[in-house]
Amino acid sequence: MSPSFRSQARPTRQRRSVLQAGAALLAATLAGGAAAQAREVVIGYQDMVVPWRYAQETGELEKRTGYKVTYRKLGSGAEVVRALASGAIQIGEAGSSPFAAALSQGVPIEVFWILDDIHDAEALVARNGSGIGTLADLKGRKIGLPFVSTTHFHALVALQDAGVDPRAVQILNLRPPEILAAWERGDIDATFVWDPALAKVKQSGRVIATSGQIAARTGKATFDALAVSKSFAREHDAFLARFVQVLADADRAYTADKGGWTAASPQVQAVAKWTGAEAASVPASLALYAFVPPAEQAGPRWLGGGKASVVAQSLAATAAFLKEQGTVHSVLPDYSVGVNPAWVQRAQ
């Protein structure tokens, strides 16, 4: 509330805010209850190029669970987090940075599956002819990226590591489709993004740094994951166990036959359809990621290690950095409260 409002208006406005918040919470609770009774789920996904898009296309999750599954495409991790918080979706895909921010803000979610270890699948690209050849050259220039995303986090990390004050760079909050439009118009000098947008900007740009290089240099790694609303998870244990098995089988099928995932294959055609990528670029895009097998995810290094796990430590480091930047106001003492290995530990 603005301090210019008169004090006598505050009780009424505060009560209205409380009532509105209560109504929103009740609506989300009722929505969750309705989903529980009807065996329905809404899954928010993004445009990451990952193997399980083929399972989305074939309806594999529906076949194995008997649930009605609705997929809702969202434009950024921040949108996914807001949808989880409101109850509009029960499960969502996002990067480690949005989930770190969500947990720091008290959103009741649990990370339960690592979609990918990002490695070189996200990159900072400068436009050809921009005169940008190093991170130092970004001073005073415009970078387009989605705020509170893994690329936002790594852009800030990379700039600081290079001795560049992020405030000396114009960082614009753009979702991938908006990045492509701004790139085509010449409104931005650089972008930090993932495929399919990454493949398109590479055609007229130069890679300055990848997430894998930044992680190797700074020790701050990033990943994409799936998280579930805690209230939904309590009521749908068997569904989540089968969902994780679908995810594991999708990754295994790709890893065992990478050569078969050609541009003309039904698998790659499905990935292209669900993400908006060009089929010809999908095989190379998939190769940039590392897909972590369920046995490794279940172990102490990833989801199963409690506070000392890679996931909890990465979430904590990301949240601490976001707090320094003013993106979040507080950090949790232990981010393993937002990590649940139970379902991946039962996967085969």
Segments predicted by a language model, with ranges:
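Helix N-cap/coil-helix junction residues
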Residues: 107, 164, 277, 327-328
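Short, glycine-/small- and polar/acidic-enriched structural segments
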Residues: 37-178, 189-195, 211-212
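Conserved C-terminal helix/tail region of periplasmic/extracytoplasmic solute-binding proteins
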Residues: 311-348
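N-terminal signal peptide c-region/cleavage motif recognized by signal peptidases
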Residues: 31-33
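Secondary-structure end/capping motifs
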Residues: 234-324
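Pocket-lining segment of extracytoplasmic ligand-binding domains
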Residues: 178-276
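N-terminal secretory signal peptides and thylakoid transit peptides that target proteins
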Residues: 8-25
